[in-house]
Amino acid sequence: MSGLTYEDVSGGVGLRVTVPVTMGPDGAARELAPRLSALAGERAPASPHGEPARATRAVPVVTIDGYSGSGKSTLAAALARLVNGWQVLHLDDWYPGWDGLEAGADIARRIAADLRAGRASSYEAWDWENGTTGATIPVPLAPTIIEGCGAIEAEADLVIWIADPGEDERRSRALARDGQTYAPHWQRWADQDLGRPVK
């Protein structure tokens, strides 16, 4: 029996799925993978010979969101192992610094809009060590998972929200993942993260 809950996203844009705290990333990925495969299949245009043609139009976009340390990256990695042909984009790669959650969400919205309109996209990578923008990274036209705090802001075919396991658990996971470099910024980031509207 599924532990996932489903609801229509306002405006009929897509479907929102909530992953409960009690469901691990591998179990959630196993349940979600067939839905992603179906989305990719629906968007693959057929050639005149009845074979799938190379995508030249809109591609599906799936977003994974949840508060910092909730398991977004882990779920994205688990899904990527189960579905072929999907690229995974991480908002961590383009947030412009520790105060950049809103700007990162804007970039996610733009990338999703480009891909859903059948256009390749790009973003400027953020150099966390030097606190500056880095290289421009191309985002090819391919089925895409966008994960990170603020990803829910982008219009998507499927929006995945990971339920909050509680601040202590999230902080523990985030610091285990990012080390002590994140520790002095935890509250600063949490204020943005918890203060944002979650649709």
Residue spans for each PLM region:
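Small-molecule kinase domains that catalyze NTP-dependent phosphoryl transfer to phosphate-bearing small molecules
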Residues: 4, 179-199
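ATP-dependent NMP and nucleoside kinases share a basic, alpha-helical "lid"
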Residues: 135-177
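Charged, amphipathic alpha-helical linker segments immediately N-terminal to NTP-binding catalytic cores
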Residues: 1-27
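Conserved lysine of the Walker
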Residues: 72
